[in-house]
Amino acid sequence: MTLLGTALRPAATRVMLLGSGELGKEVAIECQRLGVEVIAVDRYADAPAMHVAHRSHVINMLDGDALRRVVELEKPHYIVPEIEAIATDMLIQLEEEGLNVVPCARATKLTMNREGIRRLAAEELQLPTSTYRFADSESLFREAVADIGYPCIVKPVMSSSGKGQTFIRSAEQLAQAWKYAQQGGRAGAGRVIVEGVVKFDFEITLLTVSAVDGVHFCAPVGHRQEDGDYRESWQPQQMSPLALERAQEIARKVVLALGGYGLFGVELFVCSDEVIFSEVSPRPHDTGMVTLISQDLSEFALHVRAFLGLPVGGIRQYGPAASAVILPQLTSQNVTFDNVQNAVGADLQIRLFGKPEIDGSRRLGVALATAESVVDAIERAKHAAGQVKVQG
């Protein structure tokens, strides 16, 4: 039996978000729908989830002592990481002391960097992956590239949104690729992964829920990447029944090996009927924002339902749908959005994240659309995103 308290009352059920970006904001909203008290934590003030939380704190989440202090102050029943850059050793300590880390502290530690999850998938679970090598110096990086061959991809073992990634075609790129990888890591300079390029027809995110009533799968989400970050996503991605069966089997093995209740974003390469594991996030995935319009329960609602110990039951997918990011480039601490009236309509929505500032290129919103076909939904979402004029 799941007992939920009422926010701001002595018996409140308290959820602490570690990371308060646009994904955390939607998790906070879903918690609010259930009367759950929300505490939003991030490294900067006025982050999106802080706008809809009961309280907020600004700390360096890589500082274990600072993390412990805010947890001891707020006494959350659930600690919900939204990002990778967190003091995961402290999360393990806190879990050992009886706190509930979502989905579990081991999952957050293993997926905090690409090495932990790659070794779990390829070496422990024996799942198909790309060829890979790890390196923690420029000389070892060059050896790894020579081993893997061209073309290949280098990524910091800990980064997000494509930061620090380079697609390497020749030796002339190596010095710059190493330098860029060292600048792009979430926790500063350090270790990298060099991956062989996988031949694939398309990439998917298989949003997979581990809940009290078993493992559930959303329809596969297709997406287009540019500069390591997603630009559009759509659902459902068409694939063969055999490929879908293999994708679900890989996702099931990964989430059960990681453990705990919650939603996982399992990234996979698909080539005909073959499926290759890429990465996994033990939390809602940015490409899954399409589920805000495509499903009866969004990925955020599913995450909250699962970690609170509630049954999922089933997931209803409404048909062809897409998301397209609103990604302006400017510098401002007072952003405004014009022409919004032309970005919304029947079966057409937008989400503006409320990020407090922009310096360069930053994802500030997303357009969401449904249509008779995935192709039409993508075009509708892209057109809507293009209608929003960001000023500052």
UniProtKB/Swiss-Prot annotation:
Q: Pfam families attached here?
A: ATP-grasp, PurT_C, RS_preATP-grasp-like
Q: Which UniProt keywords apply?
A: ATP-binding, Ligase, Magnesium, Metal-binding, Nucleotide-binding, Purine biosynthesis
Signal sequence segment: none
Entry keyword annotation includes Magnesium: yes
Sequence ranges assigned to domain ATP-grasp in this UniProt record: 119-308
Q: Which residues bind N(1)-(5-phospho-beta-D-ribosyl)glycinamide?
A: E22, L23, E82, D286, K355, R362, R363
Q: In which pathway does it act?
A: Purine metabolism; IMP biosynthesis via de novo pathway; N(2)-formyl-N(1)-(5-phospho-D-ribosyl)glycinamide from N(1)-(5-phospho-D-ribosyl)glycinamide (formate route): step 1/1
Q: What does this protein do?
A: Involved in the de novo purine biosynthesis. Catalyzes the transfer of formate to 5-phospho-ribosyl-glycinamide (GAR), producing 5-phospho-ribosyl-N-formylglycinamide (FGAR). Formate is provided by PurU via hydrolysis of 10-formyl-tetrahydrofolate.
Q: What is the designated name of this protein?
A: Formate-dependent phosphoribosylglycinamide formyltransferase
Q: Which organism is it from?
A: Shigella boydii serotype 18 (strain CDC 3083-94 / BS512)
Q: Which gene encodes it?
A: purT
